[in-house]
A protein has these predicted regions:
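Non-heme Fe(II)-dependent double-stranded beta-helix
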Residues: 1-15, 19-97
């Protein structure tokens, strides 16, 4: 099981979130990005910017990301063994044109 560092745990307790957690390999990130780009091509940029809520029900790659063993290990280290995926949501920050 991957463990969080004490500084990360402290940040999570104080701020309620963490960022910059290194979970996925470059190849995994590339694969997820390709799948997201295909989803964006189907649904449109506006929908993908804020409207991808609970897409893990329809999109296997979102489910795979949300249930990644490395992610679950990290979350269990922070929150305990019993976890449940309540929802997924993409927040896409596109460049201003």
């Amino acid at each position: 099981m991957l463990k969080m560092g004490s500084n990360q745990k402290k940040t999570y307790r104080e701020q309620g979130f963490l960022n910059g957690i290194d979970l996925f390999s470059d190849d995994e990130i590339s694969g997820y990005r390709k799948q997201f780009d295909a989803l964006e091509a189907r649904l449109g940029r506006e929908t993908c910017q804020i409207g991808l809520v609970n897409s893990h029900f329809e999109e296997r790659f979102v489910w795979d990301m949300a249930t990644d063993p490395g992610l679950l290990d990290q979350m269990q280290d922070l929150m305990g063994e019993d976890l449940m995926v309540l929802g997924t949501h993409f927040f896409c920050k596109y460049p201003v044109e």
